[in-house]
Structures are given as structure tokens and as C-alpha cells.
């Protein structure tokens, strides 16, 4: 050793599987919730959650369009966050997660062809109680 100290933040981390990305997003969400707690707007949590994964080299995109066409009429959905083009993240700040919101994430997975989705509700005392993970099939794309 030459006496230099390295923190985890200075060591490049390869994050390239849906499982690794999912773990990185959950870790980032925990950081955001620890700092800000419950009660903010979804848009604030989305901005914070987009920032954190970028710090470890992950690409993230907000408001990703999922077009659906029915009889010539374009309908569409928007994914809150898509991390590394692998993991769909739907962010909420509500009193409770209804089955409709869970079905929403499953629909996003089906329409996007992605294998892992996270539904994260920041309006809870302990964030572990606000995270639901969804898997679309068994193919880890």
C-alpha cells in the first residue's frame, strides 16, 4: 500500500444486471428517505432518486413514454424513472399503495419488456415498508 485511502465512492462499480440496478436503486431510495423523510411531493423524490444512481455511473431517464395505440388512437403511459434501461421505477408519496398502483407497475413491465420494476412509496415512516419489487417473467433481460 502506498498510504492512499479509497472510499467506496471513488472505486468505479460495474452495475449491469437488473438485480444489481435494483439493489442500487433501493440503496439510493434509502439515502433519499433518510435525508428527507416522508411528506414531500413525488416530483421531489423523483429528482432526488434520479440524481443518486448517477453518482455510481448509472444512466437514468425520467418520464419515459410507453405508447399504446387502440384503433388508431394513441394512448400512453409514462414511467417515472428507467434506470440503466433495465429497471422500471414508479414513485409514490401516498398514504397507501392500492392494487391499482401495483397493477400499473406490472403493466409498465409488460409494455416495456423489462424484467424488474420497483414501486417506491416515500410516504412511510420506514422506507422498507414502502418498497415493492415486481418481476416480469423469469427472463432476466
Functional labels for PLM-detected ranges:
Residues 70-74, 127-128:
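Acidic pyrophosphate-coordinating catalytic loop
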Residues 37, 79-97, 108:
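Conserved catalytic cores of phosphodiester-cleaving nucleases, focusing on short active-site segments
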Residues 1-57, 128-129, 133-141:
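Solvent-exposed, charged helical/coil patches
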Residues 92-139:
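Nucleic-acid nuclease catalytic cores
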Residues 75-76, 102:
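Structural motif corresponding to alpha-helix initiation and N-cap regions
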Residues 64-66, 77-79, 115:
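Short beta-strand or tight-loop elements
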Residues 54-69:
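A short acidic/basic microdomain associated with nuclease active sites
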Amino acid at each position: 500500500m502506498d498510504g492512499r485511502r479509497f472510499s467506496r465512492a471513488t472505486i468505479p462499480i460495474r452495475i449491469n444486471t437488473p438485480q444489481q440496478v435494483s439493489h442500487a436503486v433501493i440503496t439510493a431510495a434509502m439515502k433519499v428517505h433518510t435525508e428527507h423523510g416522508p411528506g414531500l411531493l413525488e416530483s421531489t423524490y423523483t429528482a432526488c432518486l434520479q440524481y443518486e444512481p448517477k453518482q455510481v455511473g448509472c444512466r437514468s431517464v425520467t418520464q419515459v413514454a410507453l405508447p399504446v395505440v387502440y384503433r388508431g388512437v394513441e394512448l400512453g403511459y409514462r414511467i417515472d424513472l428507467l434506470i440503466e434501461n433495465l429497471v422500471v421505477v414508479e414513485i409514490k408519496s401516498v398514504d397507501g399503495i392500492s392494487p391499482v398502483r401495483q397493477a400499473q407497475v406490472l403493466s409498465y413491465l409488460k409494455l416495456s419488456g423489462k424484467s424488474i420494476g420497483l414501486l417506491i412509496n416515500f410516504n412511510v415512516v420506514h422506507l422498507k415498508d414502502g418498497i415493492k419489487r415486481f418481476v416480469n417473467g423469469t427472463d432476466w433481460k
